[in-house]
């Protein structure tokens, strides 16, 4: 079975390959045929054909394809822009061009656009102030008549009442009746009024102002219906009634009485304000509807806000103060306030401080309106009690402090009257305390100011100041044990300033202790500040000695942090000074080789000793490394000269300081021990150009070491050496104005001239190093 399947598969594969090969051969033949046809067509163009054959043949159209050429790019020339040569148009021409189109075509056969345009025009005319008003239509008059007939009969007035209203409006000069009668050519007769208000015969013949005066309830708020005539002076007075939305004006019948009552209130409030009484300013008042007047539309408030009177005009006398209190109660019955009646008086310290015989007091306290009358008796009792206690305090040598504030008003925190004032744990002077808040600005007469003592509603203060009597003239500070002390403007800690006040002492007492006037035996202690105490350190004293070192000894700048010693080499070489030959140390090797010398400065810290006077200069106090006899005070600033032998070995006596033999000399020894190969490798590492000979390389390194001193030459790696040399060289150039100006002006620098300038300052650098510096900083150089 398997063999049959295998044979079938092999036959299918064979037939498929045959079909594929036949298909490929057919495709190849087809492609060759097409290629031949194309070639023949191309060759037919070269075939010679006679005229007869041309007539018999139908030649195919020949299409000629032209090669597109690129347009030559035109060179754009830069030229000035030509101005606009058009003639400026006048405003009339601009308007004519803007309205060239026919605007009436917009409204043609379109009623909606016409209505929209007319509506917009009517809205814009409503806001105008012209006196020409539109007439009320017949439908609107019918609506007014129907609305009036629907009102109750109680609100209808008689002919006499209407006449009185018209007369009152003419006399007062306000009201809508004057608007209706503003046209002198039109006047209302009895028939017009009867038709307008629909009055019957009984109402026309009645003598009373109202048809039902006795039946009307005074508490009822039924309104009177008033309408406008055809002549309206303002667009706001025009009655625009539509079919679905109609309006009418309801005026309260008690407007006249309310306006009159409001005028009375204003006159009374003006009278009380002139007398110096304060009327509280209400934040919100009752406002009613607005009434329209004749030419100028005026707004009249039914209840106007009383004017505010400053606190400095408060309480001129007792009678006026009582009268003011009654007026405030009367206003409170009529005016409904939406804010709590809390009034805080801000006192002026300059005008309200009263000069009393003994101590003066000023209480910084909030004032509430409801405590003005209740605390008057407490004020007088407090003053009497205070005078008695002040007499007793004279025997104990204590008096209350005079607390004077500056001209800035003191604003107390806003608290409600229901809240009790916070009681401070610190006792006030001589027990003059009131549990309730006390007004500060209350006065009996303008000439006399009553000062009240009360607690300050604020956080308890840890310090209380009390002024003593003139016998002791000392100011004491009382504070509690549980509270810390802080430096204030009155208390003085640290370095006291020169003031006219008495010195400050501190008395310790516990909370709730007896009064300060009774506790006269309190302990006096020093003031302890809450800030960290800064320890005082003894000032360091440094002594500087200047020496002249000559011969072969080379001294470098050196710092010894352990012994606080600094050696500094001063400037360039100086000419030798002529010194006494007796003080000169002879040279052991060559006494003639002493042409060169240098000046060094040695600075050392002075250890102060208490047993000696600082003004005296003794040998024990001297910190000079080279003690060449004692110096007088006049010769301290002079330079002491010391000539040493030309040998490298130097003994400086018994000073015990060997800093001159330290790492500075050891570094030179380490460099000298290096071989030529090692020096050449070091030169390559530092970016320097190696030279022939070990001595020459040592000379170059010695010059660089002196130039970058006190930097260690062996500790520098890579480009650090070049950077140190360049930084030092740049610093020297900036210090010399001549060279700095030449470099800033890009003047070519001669390297040899720069080298000579450095040699004059005892700096020895090679030309290669200077050239590398100039190339690095883009400085132009020349060899000529």
Curated annotation (Swiss-Prot):
Principal place of residence: nucleus
Protein name: Structure-specific endonuclease subunit SLX4
Functional summary from the UniProt entry: Regulatory subunit of the SLX1-SLX4 structure-specific endonuclease that resolves DNA secondary structures generated during DNA repair and recombination. Has endonuclease activity towards branched DNA substrates, introducing single-strand cuts in duplex DNA close to junctions with ss-DNA.
A GO-annotated cellular component: Slx1-Slx4 complex
Regions of compositional bias (Basic residues) in chain numbering: 73-89
Family: Belongs to the SLX4 family.
Species of provenance: Candida dubliniensis (strain CD36 / ATCC MYA-646 / CBS 7987 / NCPF 3949 / NRRL Y-17841)
Known partners and oligomeric status: Forms a heterodimer with SLX1.
Region entry Disordered, spans: 73-92, 400-421
Classification via Pfam families: Slx4 (PF09494)
Post-translational modification: Phosphorylated in response to DNA damage.
Polar residues: bias regions: 405-415
Keywords: DNA damage, DNA recombination, DNA repair, Nucleus, Phosphoprotein
Location relative to the cell: Nucleus
Listed GO MF terms: 5'-flap endonuclease activity
Alphabetical GO biological process terms: DNA recombination; DNA repair; DNA replication
């Amino acid at each position: 079975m398997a063999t049959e399947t295998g044979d079938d598969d092999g036959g299918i594969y064979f037939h498929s390959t045959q079909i594929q090969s036949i298909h490929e051969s057919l495709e190849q033949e087809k492609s060759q045929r097409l290629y031949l046809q194309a070639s023949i067509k191309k060759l037919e163009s070269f075939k010679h054909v006679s005229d007869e054959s041309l007539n018999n043949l139908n030649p195919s159209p020949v299409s000629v394809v032209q090669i597109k050429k690129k347009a030559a790019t035109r060179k754009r020339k830069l030229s000035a822009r030509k101005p606009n040569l058009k003639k400026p148009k006048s405003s009339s021409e601009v308007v004519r061009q803007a309205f060239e189109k026919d605007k009436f075509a917009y409204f043609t056969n379109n009623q909606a656009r016409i209505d929209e345009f007319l509506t917009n025009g009517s809205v814009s005319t409503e806001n105008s102030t012209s006196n020409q008003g539109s007439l009320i239509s017949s439908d609107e008059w019918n609506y007014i008549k129907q609305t009036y007939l629907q009102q109750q009969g109680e609100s209808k007035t008689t002919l006499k009442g209407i006449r009185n209203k018209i007369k009152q409006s003419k006399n007062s000069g306000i009201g809508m009746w004057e608007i209706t009668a503003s046209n002198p050519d039109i006047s209302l007769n009895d028939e017009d009024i009867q038709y307008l208000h629909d009055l019957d015969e009984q109402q026309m013949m009645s003598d009373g102002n109202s048809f039902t005066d006795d039946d009307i309830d005074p508490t009822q708020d039924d309104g009177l219906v008033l309408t406008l005539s055809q002549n309206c002076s303002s667009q706001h007075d025009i009655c625009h009634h539509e079919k679905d939305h109609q309006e009418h004006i309801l005026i309260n019948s008690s407007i006249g009485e309310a306006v009159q009552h409001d005028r009375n209130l204003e006159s009374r409030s003006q009278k009380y304000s002139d007398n110096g009484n304060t009327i509280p300013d209400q934040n919100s008042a009752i406002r009613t509807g607005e009434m329209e007047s004749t030419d100028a539309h005026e707004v009249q408030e039914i209840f106007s806000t009383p004017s505010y009177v400053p606190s400095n005009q408060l309480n001129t006398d007792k009678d006026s103060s009582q009268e003011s209190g009654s007026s405030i109660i009367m206003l409170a019955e009529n005016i409904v306030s939406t804010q709590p009646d809390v009034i805080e008086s801000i006192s002026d310290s300059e005008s309200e401080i009263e000069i009393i015989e003994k101590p003066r007091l000023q209480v910084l306290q909030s004032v509430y309106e409801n405590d003005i009358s209740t605390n008057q008796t407490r004020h007088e009792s407090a003053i009497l009690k205070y005078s008695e206690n002040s007499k007793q305090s004279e025997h104990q040598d204590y008096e209350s402090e005079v607390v004077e504030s500056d001209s800035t008003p003191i604003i107390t925190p806003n608290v409600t009257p229901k809240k009790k004032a916070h009681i401070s744990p610190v006792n006030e002077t001589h027990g003059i305390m009131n549990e309730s808040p006390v007004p500060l600005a209350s006065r009996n007469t303008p000439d006399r100011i009553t000062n009240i003592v009360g607690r300050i509603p604020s956080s308890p203060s840890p310090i209380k100041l009390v002024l003593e009597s003139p016998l002791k003239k000392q100011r004491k500070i009382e504070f509690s044990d549980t509270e810390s002390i802080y430096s204030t403007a009155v208390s003085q800690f640290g370095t006291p300033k020169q003031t006219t006040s008495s010195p400050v002492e501190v008395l310790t007492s516990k909370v709730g202790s007896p009064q300060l006037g009774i506790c006269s035996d309190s302990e006096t202690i020093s003031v302890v500040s809450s800030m960290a105490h800064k320890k005082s350190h003894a000032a360091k004293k440094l002594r500087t000695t200047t020496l002249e070192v000559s011969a072969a000894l080379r001294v470098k700048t050196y710092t010894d942090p352990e012994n606080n010693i600094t050696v500094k080499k001063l400037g360039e070489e100086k000419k030798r000074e002529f010194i006494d030959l007796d003080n000169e140390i002879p040279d052991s090797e060559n006494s003639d080789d002493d042409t060169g010398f240098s000046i060094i400065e040695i600075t050392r810290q002075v250890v102060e000793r208490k047993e000696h006077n600082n003004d005296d200069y003794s040998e024990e106090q001297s910190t000079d490394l080279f003690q060449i006899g004692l110096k007088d005070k006049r010769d301290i600033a002079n330079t002491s000269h010391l000539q040493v032998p030309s040998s490298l070995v130097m003994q400086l006596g018994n000073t015990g300081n060997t800093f001159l033999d330290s790492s500075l000399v050891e570094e030179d020894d380490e460099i000298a021990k290096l071989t030529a190969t090692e020096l050449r490798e070091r030169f390559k590492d530092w970016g320097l150009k190696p030279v022939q000979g070990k001595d020459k390389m040592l000379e170059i390194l010695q010059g660089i070491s002196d130039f970058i001193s006190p930097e260690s030459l062996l500790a520098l790696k890579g480009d650090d050496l070049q950077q140190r040399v360049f930084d030092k060289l740049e610093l020297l150039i900036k210090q010399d104005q001549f060279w700095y100006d030449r470099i800033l002006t890009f003047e070519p620098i001669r390297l040899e001239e720069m080298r000579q300038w450095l040699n004059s300052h005892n700096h020895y650098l090679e030309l290669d190093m200077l050239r590398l510096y100039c190339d690095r900083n883009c400085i132009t150089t020349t060899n000529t």
